[in-house]
Structures are given as C-alpha cells and as structure tokens.
Amino acid sequence: MASFTTNSLALRASILANPRLPPPIIRPRLSLPRKLSFNLSLHNARTIVSSAVTSSSPVLSSKPPSQFPFSDSTRSITTLVLLAGVVIKSLIQKLSVAIVNLSPQIQASFRTASPLFFASLRDRPAGYLNTPLTVVAAGLSKWLDIYSGVLMVRVLLSWFPNIPWDRQPLSAIRDLCDPYLNLFRNIIPPVFDTLDVSPLLAFAVLGTLGSILNNSRG
C-alpha cells in the first residue's frame, strides 16, 4: 500500500515538473457477452452443415413405376371374352335375317312343328318357367359353379407360401379371384389373428346366388 502511494505521488510530481508531457491515456476495456459469440458460432455451424447437406444430396426426380391391378393374362382373357361376344352377336343377327328370309315351305314346317313343341312343354312340372330368362339363369349358374371351383383352388393354394404366383396359369387365377375376395376382407376378424375366414363369406354369397338361379329355372 505504501509503494502504491509513493508511485502515485512521484507521477504527480513529474507531471507538475514537466507540464508539456501528455497525460497518460487510459484505454477502456470492452467486455462482450460470451453467449453472443456462442450463438453466432452455433448459427454459422448450422448454416454450413445445412448447405453441405443440400449440396451433397442429389435431387431424386425418378417416379415410381405405375402398378396395374391386372396382368397381361387377365387382359388377354378379357379380349377373348369381348371377341366371343362380338362373334355371337354377329351370328345372332345373321340367323335373324336368315329366318326372316326363309322359303314358304320351311315356314310352313315350322308352323306345323310349333304346336307339337308346345304340347311337349305341357308335361313339365308346375312352376317351370318357359322363358328365355331360364336359359340365361342356367348359363349363369354354370358359370358360378366354375368360378366357385376356381375360387376354391385359389384359397387352397394361398396356404402354401412358396407358390410362384407370377407364373401362368397361377397369375390368371389370382387376378380373377382376388378382386372378389377383396370385397370381403376385414368383414370377419381373423381367428387367433392368423386364420382369415373371409373366404367363407364369399363362398356363401356364391352359393346363395346359385340357389336363386336354380330356383328360377323351376
């Protein structure tokens, strides 16, 4: 403490002795907050990292390939069905034109045979419908029987996980049966969370439709 006072007195004496000397310059110290530098450095680091990520990651503009619900086999089957329908329609038109242009002798033979035909129909049991709708009902019932068999094959093969469904004719069976089976998915909850019993409902609907068509036939 004594040395500090002596130094201050000596400094004052030197200033008074030589007034031309400039006074001592006391530089103020600037204290910046530490948090500001930390926030700035953190912000700069984030901007650098984000720019590096955006520059390094390429822009993916490739679109996923469109998935079609049906394969080529189903398309070929539908085209064949359409062609068969067109051919049948043309044949019916030609037959109708040919019947109109029949000779008088053939028309007379048809007129004589028609009463015999209707007389034979009288021996049918009661409730039998003699209309063109019975033919359509019979055809639909046959198609339902065939479709039920194909559906049974699809359900039985679904129990085997190693079946190659991408090959023919398995892909055609899958494309024909899956749209109908998907209508009954999640209607009945699976048993023990593993066994799907929704195909039973699908078979029940087919059986009901078949019985209705058979009853309409008489």
Swiss-Prot record:
It is a multi-pass membrane protein. Disruption phenotype: No visible phenotype under normal growth conditions. Keywords: Chloroplast, Membrane, Plastid, Thylakoid, Transit peptide, Transmembrane, Transmembrane helix. The chain crosses the membrane at residues 133-153, 187-207. It comes from the Eukaryota. Its main location: plastid. GO terms for cellular component: chloroplast; chloroplast envelope; chloroplast thylakoid membrane; plasma membrane. It is found in: Plastid, Chloroplast thylakoid membrane. InterPro entries: CCB3/YggT. Residues 1-83 form a transit peptide. Not required for the biogenesis and accumulation of native cytochrome b6 in the thylakoid membrane. Not functionally involved in the pathway for covalent binding of the c-type heme to cytochrome b6. Belongs to the YggT family. This is YlmG homolog protein 1-2, chloroplastic. It comes from Arabidopsis thaliana. The gene is YLMG1-2.
